[in-house]
Structure formats: C-alpha cells, structure tokens
UniProtKB/Swiss-Prot annotation:
Gene: petA
Keyword Cell division attributed: no
Gene3D superfamilies, sorted: 2.40.50.100, Cytochrome f large domain (2.60.40.830), Single helix bin (1.20.5.700)
Annotated organism of origin: Cycas taitungensis
Name of the protein in its database record: Cytochrome f
Main location, first listed in the record: plastid
Domain of life according to the entry: Eukaryota
Entry membrane topology: Single-pass membrane protein
Length: 320
C-alpha cells in the first residue's frame, strides 16, 4: 500500500514538473519572439541617428528596398493611411535561431512629425481596420507617440503594412503649424546578423580567427561545428565555434588564412529606409482656394455670355 502511494506521488510530481517546464518554455519563447523591436528600443533613445541613419541597420547589415506611401496633404484632426511596403520573396526561407529553415518575418519603424500619432481605435474606419488586420503597433517610447514600431510579423501576410495615423490640430496644439513635414521609415525582412551586444547571430558568415591547417571538424549533437585549427606560426590549436545554420565551406586538412570564410552567408533578408513628405493643410486655405476657383469659373462664364451678347449685337447691326 505504501509503495502504491509513493508511486502515485511520484507520478503527480512528474506531471506537475512537466507542466511547469512547458509553461516556462512557452513564456520564454513568446518573450523572445516578441523581443526583436525591443532590441533597438533598449539600446537607443532615438531610432534615427543625427546622420539620418536608422539604427536597425546596425544589426541588419544587408540592404534591401522599402517604400512608403502617404497622402500629399491632410487636414487637421483626420485619420489617414501610411502604407509601408517591404518587398520580399515568399519562396525564400531564412535560417531560424535553432538552425532550421523557416518563413521570412518583417518589421518596420515609422518616425512621424511632432504631433502626429497612432489613431485611436474609435477613430479608425472599418475599411482601414480591414487593411490593418491583426497587427499590433506600439510606441518606441511611452512618451514618444510619434515613433511607431511593428514586428516581427509574417512576411507572407504583411509585406504591406498599413499604419493608421491621426494628424494634429494646430488649434489645440500650439507646437504644431500648417507646414510641410518629413516622414521617415525603416523596414526589414528576416533576422539580423548582429545582436545589440555586438555578438553574431547564426544568420551571418563565420570567418577563421587564425591562419593554419584545419586538423579537426566536430559536428555538435545539437547542430553547429567545432573547428580545430593548428596555428601556422606557433603550432597551438585554436577552436572556432560555428552555430547551427550556416553551411561549412572548408574541410579537414585544408590550409586556411585568417578571416577566410568558414561558412556561407545564410542571410536572405535585409534592411532599408526611406522617407516621404506630407503637408498639414489649413482648412481656411482650402476654402480660399475653392472660392478662388469658383470665382474664376464664374468669370469665365460671364465672359462667354458677354462675348455671345456682343456677337448678337454685331450681327443685328450688320443685318440693319
């Protein structure tokens, strides 16, 4: 009877332990997958450097195109679309953190003029909501509503990201004026090559740390390689570690030089940045323009009528 109780207790303990481990794994996995935009947020106060370079390029080394479309002008206190296009080949697979291949993800940072911000849900029309889908936008900082980040999200579904933006009203915000403003955007597809601490990810090329002969290549149980190089100058052995993901380009017995690539470059993604301009239009100016156009049209009509009247008078005089 005592043995049965002990067995039941052990069974319950193992079940609870497995459940706890699964929960920890899920929480950790979720936090890591959602951490990519936070890399820049944690390391930089402002995502755009004084030179105009967006800091995402420090981790995403390859260059790829990105486009942004915004209206030429908007009225105060109105919601408009800022459409960011991140072209990517849906057939290409990227190297994941575990070394396996997976679909490309995308992300973007949108730097708006002072006063512009993400539109509140109750101001977004059903048409724009349908274009947004299930995307979740966040501020770069709690006090920086004009800088928005998104991602990583599946590139297959969101190669075009629609940001719903609310324009400011100079009548209530004295810091804003009716002017032409710049908008900056950065967009990436795929994982980065360098982490914020300067260490390499497994999504980049690995080079030899010394010159010598490759004496041993050990394939690790969980993937990746340990490459032993006999230094050509002093004979000491140097071990270079290659994580799972990149493919080896060298073999045992081969003589290699320092900085020679040991692997291919598995990166298929890249980062790009662009800009656009938008005019915050004064409604009174628009009304004035409409009145001017109306007056010009009326003047043209009166001129045509006057001309016809004059022609009739001339025709009557000729007949007389």
């Amino acid at each position: 009877m005592r043995n049965i109780n002990t067995y039941d207790w052990m069974k319950k303990w193992m079940t609870r332990s497995i459940s706890i481990l699964v929960m920890i794994h899920m929480i950790t996995r979720t936090s890591i997958s959602n951490a990519y935009p936070i890399f820049a947020q944690q390391g930089y106060e402002n995502p755009r450097e004084a030179t105009g370079r967006i800091v995402c390029a420090n981790c995403h080394l390859a260059k790829k195109p990105v486009n942004i479309e915004v209206p030429q002008s908007v009225l105060p206190d109105t919601v408009f679309e800022a459409v960011v296009q991140i072209p990517c080949d849906m057939q290409i697979k990227q190297v994941l953190a575990n070394g396996k291949k997976g679909a490309l993800n995308v992300g973007a940072v949108l730097i708006l003029p002072e006063g512009f911000e993400l539109a509140p849900p109750d101001r977004i029309s059903p048409e724009i909501k349908e274009k947004i889908g299930n995307l979740y936008f966040q501020n770069y900082r709690p006090n920086q509503k004009e800088i928005l980040v998104i991602g990583p999200v599946p590139g297959q579904k969101y190669s075009e990201i629609v940001f719903p933006i609310l324009s400011p009203n100079p009548a209530t915000n004295k810091e804003v004026h009716f002017l032409k403003y710049p908008i900056y955007v950065g967009g990436n597809r795929g994982r980065g090559q360098i982490y914020p601490d300067g260490s390499k990810s497994n999504n980049t090329v690995y080079n030899a740390s010394t010159t010598g002969r490759v004496s041993k290549i050990l394939r690790k149980e969980k993937g990746g390689y340990e490459i032993t190089i006999d230094n050509a100058s002093d004979g000491r052995q140097v071990v270079d570690i290659v994580p799972p993901g990149p493919e080896l380009l060298i073999s045992e017995g081969e003589f290699i030089k320092v900085d020679q690539p040991l692997t291919n470059n598995p990166n298929v993604g890249g980062f790009g940045q662009g800009d656009a301009e938008i005019v915050l239009q004064d409604p009174l100016r628009v009304q004035g323009l409409l009145l001017l156009l109306a007056s010009v049209i009326l003047a043209q009509i009166f001129l045509v009528l006057k001309k016809k009247q004059f022609e009739k008078v001339q025709l009557a005089e000729m007949n007389f």
